[in-house]
């Protein structure tokens, strides 16, 4: 399973900011890492508040045993809350969502849950299982609101799978599928939203456009996304990547720190 842990991220930041030679040490800008110290100091309290929020939702769920609509909503909220926090718990709740949808014979919700499960499995590193679900869904029969869910699940599946296989013939086919589903996701994403800007940044990056252009998309995400979590972390990391390509060490370090800060202060564990 592919887990993203905080400690490797901190190590990665430290290594990336180290000068590679004596000349570099004279020019490499100094970065204030104390912001991460303060974030680490409050991480336990942040997690405690988030755990309390989860506990409150579970309590509400226990009072809604016969209210299928409310149960469906709460189960889905719990799945979403766990999706970047604890993979195993997210998997438990996506299965409960599936059972609830089947019990209420809600075909639309069943397909939505299936696609969300594929996305979750992709994030967890189960690429083949995610692809099996995606291929089991008839895209041509989906309404527009589920076509986005389909495309984004497929996109991330092939992004992660391609990165896992590294540079070989299999990776090339994954890259082709990644591009195809990215275009579809952009088509059905809400234009002008933080998520749409992020996807446009991804397209610019994979098309190998000028990083000065690519980074503008990610900066638009950060102007719109004010909640610490996965999207902010990903956008900040992608912005840092662009600045590294532009040889802007100061901005590179600043956005890596922002990415780590978002991981620490948001519900991001895996």
Q: Where in the sequence are the language-model features?
A:
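Bacterial N-terminal signal peptides
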Residues: 8-17
């Amino acid at each position: 399973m592919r887990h993203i842990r905080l400690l490797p991220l901190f190590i990665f930041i430290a290594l990336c900011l180290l000068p590679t030679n004596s000349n570099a040490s004279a020019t490499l800008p100094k970065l204030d890492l104390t912001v991460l110290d303060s974030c680490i100091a409050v991480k336990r309290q942040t997690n405690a508040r988030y755990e309390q929020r989860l506990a409150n939702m579970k309590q509400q769920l226990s009072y809604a045993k016969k209210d299928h609509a409310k149960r469906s909503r709460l189960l889905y909220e719990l799945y979403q809350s766990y999706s970047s926090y604890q993979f195993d718990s997210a998997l438990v709740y996506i299965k409960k969502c599936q059972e609830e949808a089947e019990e209420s014979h809600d075909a639309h919700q069943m397909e939505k849950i299936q696609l969300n499960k594929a996305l979750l499995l992709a994030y967890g590193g189960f690429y083949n299982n995610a692809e099996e679900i995606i291929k089991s869904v008839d895209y041509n029969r989906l309404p527009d609101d589920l076509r986005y869910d389909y495309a984004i699940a497929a996109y991330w599946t092939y992004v992660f799978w391609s990165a896992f296989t590294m540079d070989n013939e299999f990776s090339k086919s994954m890259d082709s599928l990644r591009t195809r589903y990215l275009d579809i996701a952009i088509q059905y994403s809400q234009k002008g939203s933080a998520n749409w800007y992020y996807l446009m940044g991804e397209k610019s990056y994979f098309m190998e456009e000028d990083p000065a252009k690519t980074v503008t998309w990610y900066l638009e995400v950060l102007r719109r996304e004010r909640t610490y979590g996965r999207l902010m972390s990903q956008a900040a990391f992608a912005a840092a990547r662009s600045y590294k390509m532009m040889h802007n060490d100061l901005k590179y370090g600043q956005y890596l720190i922002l990415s780590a800060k978002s991981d620490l202060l948001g519900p991001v564990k895996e």
